[in-house]
Curated annotation (Swiss-Prot):
Regulatory subunit of lactose synthase, changes the substrate specificity of galactosyltransferase in the mammary gland making glucose a good acceptor substrate for this enzyme. This enables LS to synthesize lactose, the major carbohydrate component of milk. In other tissues, galactosyltransferase transfers galactose onto the N-acetylglucosamine of the oligosaccharide chains in glycoproteins. Glycans are attached at residues 64, 93. The gene is LALBA. One of its GO terms (cellular component) is extracellular region. Residues 1-18 form the signal peptide. GO terms for molecular function: calcium ion binding; lactose synthase activity; lysozyme activity. Belongs to the glycosyl hydrolase 22 family. This is Alpha-lactalbumin. GO terms for biological process: defense response to Gram-negative bacterium; defense response to Gram-positive bacterium; lactose biosynthetic process. Residues 20-142 form the C-type lysozyme domain. The keyword Nucleotide-binding does not apply. Keywords: Antibiotic, Antimicrobial, Calcium, Disulfide bond, Glycoprotein, Lactose biosynthesis, Metal-binding, Milk protein, Secreted, Signal. The keyword Disulfide bond applies.
Amino acid sequence: MMSFVSLLLVGILFHATQAEQLTKCEVFRELKDLKDYGGVSLPEWVCTAFHTSGYDTQAIVQNNDSTEYGLFQINNKIWCKDDQNPHSSNICNISCDKFLDDDLTDDIMCVKKILDKVGINYWLAHKALCSEKLDQWLCEKL
């Protein structure tokens, strides 16, 4: 019985430390430090994150010669470093796997660098889907 309880606790703790699928309101709260940064509103960020990763902090997209990581799909050729692309510019000075957890602090720091260097158009979903009719991306439960 004791080993079953121990195994159950390990399973619970393991799940608690894993990345997760966030809700709209969780993303809204987590991204508060991005509000109006670079002229981009919080609803625009929530919309962009949804259309970029589906709010999945573990999202990984393999392209022909690069990989994109996390909630914001940050690319390993320029912004972060991984084993696939060890000669990355690594402008954010970070390992790409840091974008795969539910601590968005490092993601937000890199997003700000991306905004400063290339602007919001880095995220193709923004212009196409997140520049108008943003009321649906608000969270009433703050």
